[in-house]
């Protein structure tokens, strides 16, 4: 009986030591890590606002808030500036290939007729 209690106490002690070693060696600090400064977060936010359109920012906020997917979220943002070349004397419109204004996809083109 005494050996069982002794073994139990040894296991508890080793588990406690291992947990504390993991806590301090791996950086598990319950969110109190000083790795991110508020200035870095502000810079990142400003960069996102410069890169993403207002529609894309709203979609990102919607997803980060954990709201369910719907048609509004899955639909494309109207980020392209399309123009049509219409000759007043001609009723035909020609398709004009204009680049999308997204910064992530450099080969994105939209067509207007």
UniProtKB/Swiss-Prot annotation:
Q: State a GO cellular component annotated for this protein.
A: extracellular region
What UniProt keywords apply to this chain's record, in alphabetical order? Amidation, Cleavage on pair of basic residues, Neuropeptide, Pyrrolidone carboxylic acid, Secreted, Signal
Domain of life per record = Eukaryota
Residues where Pyrrolidone carboxylic acid is found:
20
Asked if the keyword Signal belongs to this entry, the reply reads yes
Statement: the UniProt record of this protein carries the keyword Thylakoid: no
Biological process terms in GO annotation: neuropeptide signaling pathway; positive regulation of heart contraction
Compositional bias, Polar residues, is annotated for: 82-96
Q: Where is this region: Disordered?
A: 74-96
Leader sequence range is 1-19
Q: Which residues carry this modification: Asparagine amide?
A: 30
- Note one Pfam family from the annotation: Corazonin
Tissue distribution of the protein: Four pairs of lateral neurosecretory cells in the brains of late instar larvae, pupae and adults.
GO molecular function terms noted in the UniProt entry: corazonin receptor binding; neuropeptide hormone activity
Task of the protein: Cardioactive peptide. Corazonin is probably involved in the physiological regulation of the heart beat.
Family membership noted in the UniProt record: Belongs to the corazonin family.
Name of the featured protein:
Pro-corazonin
> To which species is this protein native?
Galleria mellonella (Greater wax moth)
Q: Which lineage?
A: Eukaryota, Metazoa, Ecdysozoa, Arthropoda, Hexapoda
């Amino acid at each position: 009986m005494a050996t069982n209690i002794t073994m139990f106490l040894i296991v508890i002690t080793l588990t406690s030591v291992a947990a504390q070693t993991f806590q301090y060696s791996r950086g598990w600090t319950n969110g109190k890590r000083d790795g991110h400064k508020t200035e870095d977060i502000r810079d990142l936010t400003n960069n996102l606002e410069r890169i993403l359109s207002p529609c894309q920012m709203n979609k990102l906020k919607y997803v980060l808030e954990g709201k369910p997917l719907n048609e509004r979220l899955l639909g494309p943002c109207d980020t392209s500036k399309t123009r049509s070349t219409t000759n007043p004397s001609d009723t035909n419109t020609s398709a004009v290939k204009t680049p999308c204004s997204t910064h992530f996809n450099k080969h994105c083109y939209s067509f207007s007729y």
